[in-house]
Swiss-Prot record:
The gene is rpl34e. GO terms for cellular component: ribonucleoprotein complex; ribosome. One of its GO terms (biological process) is translation. This is Large ribosomal subunit protein eL34. The keyword Transferase does not apply. Pfam families: Ribosomal_L34e. One of its GO terms (molecular function) is structural constituent of ribosome.
């Protein structure tokens, strides 16, 4: 039975075969998926995906409105649409 900290499903199980032929389980942190834009579903550039706990908040995503949520092209379209709507 693994120790209680390793029973959690937040850790991914990797089966490793040793030179002796014995198979053991190694526990690793799960990898994060690539961040995608909420509108066009393209992958976001400038958003880190690995070991997020090691980075500060400003390093994890771009420092702009909707950074880490929308890509730059969708953001420009959104800003233009809101400005045009305000002018009417």
């Amino acid at each position: 039975m693994p120790r209680p900290a390793l029973r959690s499903r937040s850790l991914r199980r990797v089966y490793v075969k040793l030179p002796s032929g014995k198979t053991v389980i190694h526990y690793e942190r799960k990898r994060n998926d690539i961040a995608i834009c909420a509108i066009c579903k393209k992958p976001l550039h400038g958003v880190k995906t690995n070991f997020l706990h090691k980075y500060s908040k400003s390093e994890k995503r771009p420092e702009r409105p909707f950074g880490g949520y929308l890509c730059s092209s969708c953001l420009t379209q959104l800003i233009k649409a809101t400005v045009r709507q305000q002018l009417q």
